[in-house]
Every structure is written in structure tokens, then in C-alpha cells.
């Protein structure tokens, strides 16, 4: 569980990053969840954009993805989702070393 200072630090790190995933009309699919999980293992911090044509609510999508990937929702701002998960390999823990 992240505290407010950790969330603030992760938000500041993610603000400079572009969204690397998009959720469209199809919603949150199995392939998307697998790709997001792999990215979380490699990067620890992932920014996702929910497109305007998507019927999926960003908050609900964030909770669903977080549950399926065992990650934590850092924040949902508008249609952007930021997720964090500590990498299982210690050499991949660049972001978690900051918090």
C-alpha cells in the first residue's frame, strides 16, 4: 500500500512519461492485461490512456487492471491511469528505489 508521499513521488516521475498503452472500444482485454503486466515487470511504473471512444470508465478500468496485474493504482487523472508494481527482479527496481 502506497502512502501519500510515495504517490506524490510516483506522480512526479510519471508526469514526464508518455502513455505506453491505450484502452479503446474493446475495453480491457486479456492481451492488454498481459502486455501491461509485462511492462510493469520491466518498468514498474506504467501510464495508460483511455481513449474518448471507449465505453470503459477510467476508474473502473484502473481497478480492474490493478487487480489482474497485482499492481497498485497511483492515480487516475481524467482519462489517464498510472499504475505501479514493484518488479520481481531486483535489477529492474529503478522506480521503487526512489520511493
Where are these regions (language model features)?
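Positively charged, polar, low-complexity stretches
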Residues: 1-99
Amino acid at each position: 500500500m502506497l502512502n501519500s508521499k510515495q504517490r506524490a513521488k510516483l506522480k512526479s516521475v510519471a508526469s514526464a512519461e508518455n502513455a505506453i498503452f491505450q484502452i479503446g472500444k474493446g475495453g480491457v482485454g486479456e492481451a492488454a492485461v498481459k502486455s501491461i503486466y509485462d511492462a510493469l515487470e520491466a518498468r514498474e511504473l506504467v501510464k495508460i490512456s483511455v481513449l474518448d471512444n471507449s465505453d470503459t470508465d477510467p476508474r473502473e478500468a484502473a481497478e480492474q487492471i490493478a487487480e489482474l496485474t497485482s499492481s497498485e493504482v497511483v492515480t487516475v487523472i481524467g482519462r489517464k491511469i498510472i499504475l505501479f508494481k514493484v518488479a520481481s527482479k531486483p535489477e529492474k527496481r529503478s522506480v521503487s528505489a526512489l520511493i
